[in-house]
Amino acid sequence: MVQRSKSSANWLREHFNDPFVKQAQKDGYRSRASYKLLEIQEKDRLIRPGMSVIDLGAAPGGWSQVTSRLIGGQGRLIASDILEMDSIPDVTFIQGDFTQDEVLQQILDAVGDSHVDLVISDMAPNMSGTPEVDMPRAMFLCELALDLATRVLKPGGDFLIKIFQGEGFDMYLKDVRTKFDKVQMRKPSSSRDRSREQYLLGKGFKGA
């Protein structure tokens, strides 16, 4: 029998005792992350019926489930992740590594000649536990997501992204502020207290 590490056992215990995990199972959401987006939605009303949205780092689909329900049948949702994701009705899913040009091009092709109202990203790299390694990886994903957002957002569009406090954060925040009318930070109650993750919200894209 494989022996689990102490940290792995602690994670499993925390996971199964987590009220948001239990609530997600009850409500039919694929992950506890759904409640992070729902809480931000409650405060900021980002997602509205009929919107066009891109969801990065979508698997297993918690944010896509919430977004699809809120935009309704007249909306359009393009989701992408390096991992597989079970299909969701009316959601276009692109599987692949977002850091690769061909995957970016697939997303751009799916958007087509139109633009989108909102880009959301819950992407995070596989964490090693070493900040000197993890932060550059995380910030690289954030930079790529912002680059995509500036290509596909309509003027006035919004951008929501998971970000971690650490090296590169201040410069990134400064960059986002040059591109959006209003920038705010959000820390949903469903985000674990010990997690360094926050969500950066850029509202009112100024245009490319």
UniProtKB/Swiss-Prot annotation:
Active-site feature positions: 162
Keywords annotated in UniProt: Cytoplasm, Methyltransferase, rRNA processing, S-adenosyl-L-methionine, Transferase
InterPro entries according to UniProt: RNA_methyltr_RlmE, RNA_MeTrfase_FtsJ_dom, rRNA-MeTfrase_E, SAM-dependent_MTases_sf
GO cellular component terms listed in the entry, alphabetical order: cytoplasm
Pfam families attached to this UniProt entry: FtsJ
EC numbers: 2.1.1.166
Cellular localization per UniProt: Cytoplasm
Catalysed conversion reaction: uridine(2552) in 23S rRNA + S-adenosyl-L-methionine = 2'-O-methyluridine(2552) in 23S rRNA + S-adenosyl-L-homocysteine + H(+)
SUPFAM superfamilies named in the record: S-adenosyl-L-methionine-dependent methyltransferases
Binding site for S-adenosyl-L-methionine: 61, 63, 81, 97, 122
Superkingdom in the source lineage: Bacteria
Main subcellular localisation: cytoplasm
One of the record's GO molecular function terms: rRNA (uridine-2'-O-)-methyltransferase activity
Function according to Swiss-Prot or TrEMBL: Specifically methylates the uridine in position 2552 of 23S rRNA at the 2'-O position of the ribose in the fully assembled 50S ribosomal subunit.
Family: Belongs to the class I-like SAM-binding methyltransferase superfamily. RNA methyltransferase RlmE family.
Name of this chain's protein: Ribosomal RNA large subunit methyltransferase E
Gene: rlmE
